[in-house]
């Protein structure tokens, strides 16, 4: 029976001002082996750095399975049975795109089973699970992505990030729900704040691709981070402390992980990170990889 091996990167979204629009693929990988069987569903989950997988379902509600089923439906496939082996390294509920990675894994596996190349519908299928395309596009395409909507259609473009940028992530033990933190956002924001953040988002694209020296200014945001600061005060304080030291830091996605876009691959020695797991994560260049056996 067909065996698919999938490797998918983590991602960091928003990057400060690019709310639901900017994403960066990071070299931290979940690996999945998906085997087509005669019947039934079997799921095995192994923690290889995710920090706990006890809450991961092992039935049809598993996100990889749901995305795989949706991809198969789209492509007209009806696999008889599935055996899934998941090796999870991306921390769950930390703002590093674990759910988007799972969705991309499932959809990409369906395309591989159909022996079809990834296309625009691949992103559409993945982003529909999330409601936004920034994380999914980063895990799918790799590198630095700009995502947007055209009506109900999700779109994204991959850009080449500047070679000097060396991301560092600071991951706390605290978990955070994307739905919960989105609930902290107001329905309306002042026009001046929206205009400020739009300018910074445009600058962020330039800084990330050509001018890393502008990243400190380019990662400023008035649209979402301060509204959600109460959900993870230690992370918000770390962002403040890093920025005071000249480091371009922001909350990664919905948090609570802190992303620092450095050119040295380390954080300043004087900043207290004792309650965080700090790691340099290079930018992943290629996105999801699937091998069929």
Provide a role label for each language-model segment.
Residues 1-94, 115-116, 280-293:
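ATP-binding N-lobe of GHMP and related small-molecule kinases
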Residues 117-165, 242, 249-251, 255, ...:
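Alpha/beta catalytic cores of group-transfer enzymes, especially the acyltransferase/condensing modules
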Residues 207-293:
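Glycine-rich, charge-dense phosphate/pyrophosphate-binding loop(s)
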């Amino acid at each position: 029976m067909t065996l698919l091996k999938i490797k998918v990167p983590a991602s960091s979204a928003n990057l400060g001002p690019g709310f639901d629009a900017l994403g960066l693929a990071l070299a931290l990988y979940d690996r999945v082996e998906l085997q087509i069987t005669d019947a039934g569903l079997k799921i095995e989950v192994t923690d290889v750095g995710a920090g706990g997988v006890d809450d991961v379902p092992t039935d049809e509600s598993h996100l990889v399975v749901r995305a795989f089923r949706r991809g198969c439906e789209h492509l007209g496939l009806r696999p008889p049975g599935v055996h899934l082996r998941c090796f999870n390294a991306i921390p769950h509920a930390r703002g590093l795109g674990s759910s988007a990675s799972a969705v991309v894994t499932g959809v990409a596996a369906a395309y591989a089973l159909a022996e079809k190349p990834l296309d625009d519908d691949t992103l559409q299928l993945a982003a529909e699970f999330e409601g936004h395309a920034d994380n999914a596009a980063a895990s799918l395409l790799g590198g630095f992505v700009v995502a947007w909507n055209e009506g109900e259609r999700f779109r994204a473009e991959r850009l080449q990030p500047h070679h000097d940028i060396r991301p560092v992530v600071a991951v706390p033990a605290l978990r955070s729900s994307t739905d919960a933190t989105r609930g902290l956002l107001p329905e309306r924001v002042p026009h001046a704040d929206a205009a400020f953040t739009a300018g910074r988002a445009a600058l962020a694209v330039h800084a990330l691709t050509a001018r890393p020296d502008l990243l400190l200014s380019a990662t400023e945001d008035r649209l979402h981070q301060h509204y959600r600061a109460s959900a993870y005060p230690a992370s918000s304080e770390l962002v403040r402390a890093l920025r005071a030291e000249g480091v371009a830091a922001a909350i990664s996605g919905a948090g609570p992980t802190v992303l620092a876009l450095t050119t040295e691959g380390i954080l300043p020695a004087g900043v207290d990170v004792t309650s965080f797991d700090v790691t340099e994560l290079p930018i992943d260049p290629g996105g999801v990889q699937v091998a069929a056996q």
